[in-house]
């Protein structure tokens, strides 16, 4: 009986101590620096990201067009048109084949976007500004994006991100603000 009474006292005291312990409703971040820089990144650039952007690049064997629409709620819609052709030799003469869509990497897609400051490679990677993109083609079979690309900047006319599928000579893509249709 005495043991039971002792346990009740210990349990009551533990409950009293726990009820008096202060709990903070403020979250504690595993990486406060990354959190602060993510907040600052979003305050500076997220409002500028909202809207529609387009990019087109045409070469001898490849032509690529992409349009992205970023919404304030973190959703993303887009469309991609990508065509390729080959340089072949026929009868001793070089000529290009007809343009062909690069299936399944063409069509409309929907998904989500987010700006963050972190290292996509994990603990050993260098932290940097990234644009996280996750999107599936509307037919649901393939991903249009499931990646983190380096984010350069956004302003009134330009969105600069690291090239993923196609890129300019410097490794970046400069999207232009506004809706457009592919020239091909």
Model feature map: region roles:
Residues 2-11:
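Bacterial N-terminal signal peptides that target proteins for export
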Residues 19-22:
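C-terminal motif of bacterial Sec signal peptides marking the signal peptidase cleavage site
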Residues 24-27:
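Bacterial signal peptide processing site
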Residues 32-54, 69:
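N-terminal helix-cap/turn-to-beta initiation motif at the start of protein domains
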Residues 58-63, 81-160, 167:
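Contiguous, well-ordered beta-strand patches that form the walls/edges
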Residues 72-76:
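Structural signal for glycine-centered tight turns and loop->strand junctions in beta-sheet-rich domains
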Residues 170-184:
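Short, low-complexity, Pro/Ser/Thr/Gly-rich segments in the mature regions of secreted, periplasmic
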